[in-house]
Regions:
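Boundary/linker segments flanking structured domains
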Residues: 1-69, 73-166
C-alpha cells in the first residue's frame, strides 16, 4: 500500500504570488515564459497537486497550512490556473465557467493569493490519474487532521457563497 503521508515536494520550496504566476504563465505578445521565470515556466505544463492560500502563510508550502483555502489536482498547472482565474473573476470583471471552487473565491481578489505547486512525475495516463486523486486525498486529509476535522474552505462544495477572508 502506498504511503498515507503527503510526501510531494513543493516546487522551488515556496509559495508563488498570483502576480508572479500570471506574468510567467501568460507573458504577453512577444514574451516567453522561460525568460521571465525559468523555474516556474518549467512546470507550467506539468501535472500535480496545487494548494491555494491567503497570506499570511508559512515559508515552506504544505497542505496543512493555516490559511490554506483550496487543494486541487490537475494534469496541467497552467490550464487549471486559467480555469480558476476565469471563474474567480481574476482575468475579467465577471466570472466564467471553468473551475467550480473558484466561484466561491472572492471575486477578482489576488493581492494575498499564494499558490504552491507539487509536481508529479509523468507516467502512463491511467496511473497518473490515480496518483493525482491519491495525492489530492492525502493533501486534504493532512489539512483535515490538523484543523479539527474541517476541510479547506473552498473544498466545501455545499457552500454556495464566496468565502470572506479576514
Amino acid at each position: 500500500m502506498p504511503s498515507e503521508l503527503f510526501d510531494l515536494v513543493p516546487h522551488d520550496k515556496r509559495w508563488f504570488p498570483w502576480a508572479e504566476i500570471e506574468e510567467c504563465f501568460w507573458p504577453g505578445r512577444g514574451r516567453r515564459s522561460h525568460t521571465i521565470n525559468p523555474s516556474l515556466a518549467s512546470i507550467k505544463n506539468a501535472a500535480g497537486i496545487y494548494c491555494i492560500a491567503w497570506a499570511p502563510i508559512t515559508t515552506i508550502p504544505a497542505p496543512d497550512e493555516e490559511n490554506l483555502q483550496y487543494v486541487g489536482q490537475t494534469k496541467n498547472f497552467k490550464a487549471r490556473m486559467a480555469q480558476f482565474a476565469s471563474s474567480a473573476g481574476i482575468f475579467w470583471e465577471d466570472r466564467y465557467a471553468g473551475h467550480s471552487a473558484a466561484w466561491r473565491w472572492p471575486q477578482g481578489e489576488t493581492a494575498q493569493m499564494q499558490i504552491a505547486f507539487f509536481p508529479i512525475q509523468p507516467e502512463l495516463d491511467h496511473m497518473l490519474t490515480g496518483r493525482l486523486f491519491w495525492y489530492e486525498a492525502l493533501a486534504i486529509n493532512a489539512y483535515f487532521q490538523k484543523h479539527d476535522n474541517t476541510l479547506p474552505p473552498l473544498n466545501v462544495i455545499k457552500n454556495p457563497d464566496p468565502v470572506a477572508f479576514v
